[in-house]
């Protein structure tokens, strides 16, 4: 028994001695890449010239233009035809000229890369992490990651370092672990052990997240309210023209209060880092973001624009009315350094999807794509399946007469004995 137990250990030790350099060479290269980015990020408030570093020459970005539906098209807001925007294809030549004039005038409100993020002034809004008085700091160990996850974390850390959103930190009293969640694509059907076809979503990759649960547990909660969706939709309905805008990495535009930055520290295979800008995963981040947007668009909300998190819907009763409103909203964005994601902004369209509902001059309608998804849902076989079906169908209960009566047989199944 002793010889059987010792043999694998000896073999493993011999293998490591012979292949140690090969096993760790790739990991060393990854860590070296991270370290190369760190010197210039230690003082991100200084220009790179002041740090003795020659900035690399900036190249014009190249964008992969995805196919658009027939009612949308790409146009460019610069003479070199580098920076595209998405507008309605139904505009007349005169209307398109007027719209492009406004978009060129407010070019600074549109973001194309992370470098375009200037950061909203802390005087307007900054995120605070107020900890309960009797709470003790928590330092968690890093978690094991498979090679694919490590590559995702490495790329994300590099990207955030280069953008100045995170910085290395060595002495934080709060440390949270990194983990990766799967990004799921379309639905496919696979057989189970009983040869029954079960729909499943295909994992197409991974996304890096920070597990802030220990920090969130001892954080004082912010109860800033979100707008009522039904009231927003009513104000948007029956309008003729819309501009649907979206914040560019919205959370990353809000600064974390200086004394609270160490509480955002995370650990990964490449070191420990803290956030200068607000990360996803903090319990009060959505409330902070909604408060910030409400402050930025004060005087405009419920009058010319509807704001729900980082989705902004500018509307008007005519083209000229909507264009005038868009001019004021983009001007406010530039004044406050709020940057919009060009790829998710649609200008001067006659209809669009807002929070799962189709809005147009006709009023409020269901999103047909979501209805088809509900139709394809499998027959529920357990409590979880019943809740899923009721949740999806209940989203459109305003369009279904006597929904509570129709769904009662399913809701009865959820009652405890």
Region locations from a protein language model:
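Inter-domain linker/hinge segments that demarcate the starts of reverse transcriptase
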Residues: 32, 62, 73, 94-114, ...
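Short coil/turn segments at secondary-structure boundaries
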Residues: 46, 84-87, 112-123, 167-173, ...
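Reverse-transcriptase-like RNA-dependent polymerase core
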Residues: 62-70, 75-80, 115-138, 181-209, ...
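C-terminal reverse transcriptase regions that engage the nucleic-acid substrate
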Residues: 104-107, 111, 220, 237, ...
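Acidic, serine/threonine/proline- and glycine-enriched intrinsically disordered segments
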Residues: 255, 263, 285, 318-323, ...
